[in-house]
Amino acid sequence: MSLAAPLASALAPPSAPLAASPAAAQTAAPGLPIPGFWDPRRRPERPDLRLTLIRFMSEVDYPPFNYAGPDGNPAGFNVDLARAICDELKIACTMQMRRFDTLVESLAENRGDAAIASLAVSAETRRKVDFSDPYYRPVARFAARRGAGLDTVLPERIEGKTVAVVAGTAHEAYLRALFTEAAPKPYPTAEEARTALAKGEVDLLFGDGYSLAFWLNGTEASGCCVFVGGPFVESRYFGEGVGIAVKKGNDQLRLALNWALFRLWEKGKFADLWLKYFPVNPF
């Protein structure tokens, strides 16, 4: 069931695993790069926005980006970012929580104006919707139990190691293509994969770096595990970046979102929000 709440104002594998470049991020705190795609020399113009309401949509359950808070209302990084965008634009907004697989169709049918739900920009998604500028980039990470003796992860270093991964994901495809000597162990859900690592049923876990960072920092992990190796940012598997999706041709809203995102980054508010949700560095 959809919740609504008001807001205040087949891939060819690369030749080797691709790790993130430090130059792709802005450092806002010692040792913690903040992802960003904004160039201060390319300041977008303030839009002539004639909207009075933006109907945001987000995913139902993808913490820490989207989830239902204790009161049942939408919460998470994407929700707070939408709230900040509305404040910057001085426009009223609403938020609907929908299943991820319904968001693109909902935009096309005018059931919402913008989807802020960690939807990766790719050739396929660009055919269906238009995107704001990216505001972060998908990243994959390995995690291991503390004391496992793995300080880095290379294909030859994890030969024969059992690696938990969510079945049917880009992470499984990447693991099978690049780490051919490892032993993937697919699980139906990320929660089951994390539990397997915490219990020592597998040697490693490979998955989304952001949700893993959230887990590692939370009580559920109980300090069991740490990141090892990476990060990995191969765009052919994990996407070119994550933007806010709008209906094809809605340039007025897309440009307004670009302006608001730049302003939030320029003021340091994006970095503040990032640090709130990711005290454990996903990179």
Show where each model-derived region lies.
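Proline/Glycine/Serine-rich low-complexity intrinsically disordered segments
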Residues: 2-3, 7, 21, 26-283
